[in-house]
């Protein structure tokens, strides 16, 4: 937990520290608490510090992104490994969305591996808390109550929809994605 929170705070300036988040998180835990609740507690602890220093919004968003990626991918993935995780996940995500009748079958005609390779995982670090929470609550696709979409996949999905009728669909989708994300 300490390491996860330290990573979320890294690069955000000297005033954004992991220790207050860890301390508040630990205060709200009890014996036998499930890991999902531990992660939620860390998000809530970080969120309370946004008023003190607005840069905590980025640390909070990074903690939220971790819980979203765990929900979508079904496992912990370090941010450094998210580029490959996106490549591996993206074709299956489109297929799952089509199978659930949430996405148009025409999206399966794209070169999904090429589009997955174009996703920029480091852009997930640019979200503030409110922006990422809004995407999660309102826009990310879900099957039942489980989200199946990650932020960069969301932007690429929108880009694919915009480029359905283009001659070089993949190139145009990547161009649109670059603008959107």
What positions do the PLM features span?
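Extended catalytic cores of very large enzyme megasubunits
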Residues: 1-181
């Amino acid at each position: 937990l300490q390491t996860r929170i330290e990573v979320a705070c890294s690069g955000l300036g000297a005033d954004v520290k992991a220790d207050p988040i860890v301390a508040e998180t630990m205060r709200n835990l009890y014996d036998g608490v499930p890991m999902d609740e531990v992660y939620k507690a860390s998000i809530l602890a970080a969120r309370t510090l946004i008023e003190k220093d607005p840069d905590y919004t980025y640390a909070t968003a990074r903690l939220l992104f971790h819980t979203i990626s765990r929900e979508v991918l079904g496992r912990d993935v370090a941010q450094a490994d998210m580029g490959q995780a996106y490549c591996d996940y993206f074709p299956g995500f489109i297929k799952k969305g089509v199978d659930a009748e949430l996405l148009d079958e025409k999206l399966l005609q794209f070169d999904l591996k090429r589009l997955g390779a174009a996703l920029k995982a480091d852009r997930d670090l640019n979200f503030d808390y409110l922006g990422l929470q809004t995407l999660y609550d309102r826009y990310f696709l879900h099957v039942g109550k489980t989200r199946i979409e990650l932020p960069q996949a969301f932007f690429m999905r929108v880009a694919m929809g915009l480029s359905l009728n283009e001659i070089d669909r993949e190139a145009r989708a990547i161009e649109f994605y670059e603008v959107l994300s």
